[in-house]
Structures are given as C-alpha cells and as structure tokens.
Amino acid sequence: MKKIKSIVALGLVLAMSLTMWGCGNKDSATSNGGSSNKKSSSSAKTAEINATDDGTVLNIHCWNDEFQSRFKAYYPGYTEGKDTSTGTLKNDLGEFTVNWIITPSDDNAYQNKLDEVLPKNADASADEKVDMFLIEADYALKYVNSDYTLDVKALGLTDDDLSGMYDYTKTVCTAEDGTLRGVSWQATPGLFAYRRSIAKDVLGTDDPAEVQKSLADWDKFDAVAAQAKDKGYYMLSGYDDSYRTFSNNVSKKWVDDNKTIQIDDAIWQWVDQTKTYTDKGYNHGTSLWDDNWAADQGSKGKVFGFFYSTWGINFTLLGNSLDDQKGEEKVGNGIFGDWAVCEGPAAYYWGGSWICAAAGTDNKSLVCDIMKVLTCDASVATKITEDTQDYTNNVEAMEALAASDYKSDFLGGQNHIALFAEAAKKINISNMGPYDQGLNESFQGAMKDYFTGNVSKDDAEKAFYKAAVEKYPDLNAPK
C-alpha cells in the first residue's frame, strides 16, 4: 500500500504523552462512590461520580477481536500474555493487568452477557469490575440511555478532543440527557465491493466510475444481475446481502411510541427484491456469515459483489479473499487485488463499534486515556487507516487521505477512502432505535423460510412477530 507522506511517528509520540495529562493521573483523579443500578436515563452528575482510579485490573468486554487488535497495535505499553485473552499494560498511569472478555454476538449472547454483568458492577470486586465495553449502533441506545455508561466528558474528554469526529458517530451515543456516552475510532459508510474480473466479463470494464454508471439505481442493478446470471455468475451471495441498503433508508423506526412493532416499506422492498433474486437465481442462496457466504468471497466464488461498509472490506472481505490465510497479503494470494468499490444504488452505513466506560469502573483515567489516544487524535487515525484500510473517525485525517495518492493494493490500486469520505456525508441515523439488532436479525431469519419456499410471506411475517415479542416481551405485535 502506498502511504501519504506524513510525520505520523512524531504525531503518535506527542499524542501518547499529551493524553496522559488530559485525562489526569491516579494521584490527581477524584474518587467518589455511590451509584444507581436502576436502568433509566441518568444525569451527567450521576455518571461523573460513579468512577474511581483505584484499579490495577482492566476488564474489557467485546464481541470479537477487532478492537483488541486496534488496542494492541496503537495503544502504547501493552504486552500480550500467555494467550490472547490477557496481557499487561504499563504506562505513566501505572501497571495493569488487561483481561479481554469476548462473547460472540450470535443469538444476542453478547448483550445478554452485558445485561448480566453491568447491573452488578457497582458491587463487584475490584478485579471483576467491568471497565470498558463495546457496543454497536443497532443497540447503542439501550446502553447509552442507562445508568451503566458514563459521560465521556466526566471522564476527562473535552469538546476540542471530540471536534474532529463525524457528527453521526457522536449522535449514536448521545443520551436523552444530552451527554455523550461512547466514542468510536471508526466511521462506517457503505459501498458496493465487486470483483474486477467478473465486472470485466459482464460489463466490459472494471473501472469503478464506469461500473457505478451501471449500478447507479436499483433498476440498473437488477439489469446487471440478469446479465451476470447469463454469464454464469450470481449478482449477490445470499438473502441478506442487500439488507442494510434498505434497512438504513427507512422512513420510520422499528418500534412506534406505543411499543408496537412496525415494518417500514423499505424493508418490504428488500423482501420483494430478495425473493425475486432467489427465484431467478441471481443470488447463491447463502446466509450472512455462514461458510458458503464466506467462500463466495474467495477464489472459487462466482459472485459479482458484496455490500460492505468500511470494516467489512479490511476486516472480512480481505481475509476471505486469501487462499493462504497465513500467507502474505499481496497479489497472487487468492484474489487479493481483484476487488474494487463503487457507490452502488443507495447510500447506507453498516455497523461500527463504540467504546463505553462502564459505571463503577475503578480505572477512570486509564479508560479516558484509551479513548483519547484511539479515537481523538488525527495522527493515530491516519496511521490506523494507512496500516489497515479501516475508515477512521476523523474528518481531517480522512479528507487528507482522500485527496492524496493513497492506494489500496487489495482494491487494485484504488483510493477507496475518497469514496468513503463522500458516502460518510450521506449517513442518516434519524430512525435508529434500541431494538434494531434483535429485530433486524429476527426479521431476516423469519423471511429466509419465505425465500426458500417453505412458507408464505404472511406466515413468515407472523413468525417474525412471534419471535420478536419473545425476544422483547415489552413490545407488541400490530393487531
């Protein structure tokens, strides 16, 4: 990957030293006890007092190792232990044992884990306290509007620290009382990633600008799907691939003010499209995250492309494209270099990870420092993107890379940051709600039986409502 010329090393050194001062230290941090375990909107004052600096063990909860990899690479002083679940950290704030508690998000397991440990955090022993946990946009408000997360300004972050972030990433974690309860190192606009070799065969070109002309709206996208089928390819891998382009463009939330579930017209458009693609053989009949879906992204795959946001390209698609998972990431290993991206038929976003400080943490200054280093500094953001191709949460850094000679070897020399920078401006989270992850998953699961012809659309809808109210007993199915 060709990197822009920058004095990143100096910037990193300065960032690490300055953040220690900005977030305080163990000698100067105030320690005030008391907290409420009631799960309701809490005030900034409540958040401010429910944290101390007495700890020597840092416990971090997450659902995969993405944040863990960022922490290890870009936060100074970490040494891994005998296995990946633990390590030691030594810096100006002290010496700490770091424990990684990773619970996969399948079947809501990660949220269930948080719901088990967070209410007990105030009374947990020092070495068992949750200090930090990660959340996703689909359920962020559930924790943001609770007494389990702390106001990041009460931790020590300032408006100036937060000024470089994309506004939507702050809105996602803004509580009803106006306090900011989480920060992210990444922004996650979405694009359409396609196989260059397949695009050449189907469209006669692999140039992103020309491919985009052929995929600029859903009618054009459908027409290319038919062309791809005639050439022996699938347009998409499975039932779920285009879901986020519809679910992130809804006109209403999943749940109305009366706690009644409502299905937006955009969601039904996805259902109709996916049924058509399934019946006509435009998709390969896979499900998101299954082995066949992953295999379709490799050298034996026959799929034109995948809808992916930022993390998906560098964290998932790249890995799935390699024949030798342990080999070098370069042209010649699988289909590395045979990918490109374009805007696709609709603007959308997908996912993202936010760092939250847990109420009751006894490592207040350390948590603040981690947030500041990994999410607030332009030089760190630039370095992460240059190294990993992730799209980081700093407007200045990303605009600079977008205008530079930055290139991704994985994407055949394309500067995908330029496209992501434009897509990020179009992100709309106005209809995000606390039930999004669970209802999205239940709806997709219920409709799979309709796509495969096992049940009618009406029966699939009924199955969805049944699963939804079982998962969320406080919700109602429409009468």
List each language-model region with its residue ranges.
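Extracytoplasmic/periplasmic solute-binding protein
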Residues: 175-192, 216-262, 266-269, 303
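Hinge/lid segment of periplasmic solute-binding proteins
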Residues: 44-49, 92, 108, 122, ...
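Short helix-initiation/N-cap motifs at beta->coil->alpha
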Residues: 102-116, 216-220, 285-299
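Conserved C-terminal helix/tail region of periplasmic/extracytoplasmic solute-binding proteins
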Residues: 396-412, 417-479
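Conserved N-terminal structural module of periplasmic/extracytoplasmic solute-binding proteins
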Residues: 6-9, 18, 23-141, 382-385, ...
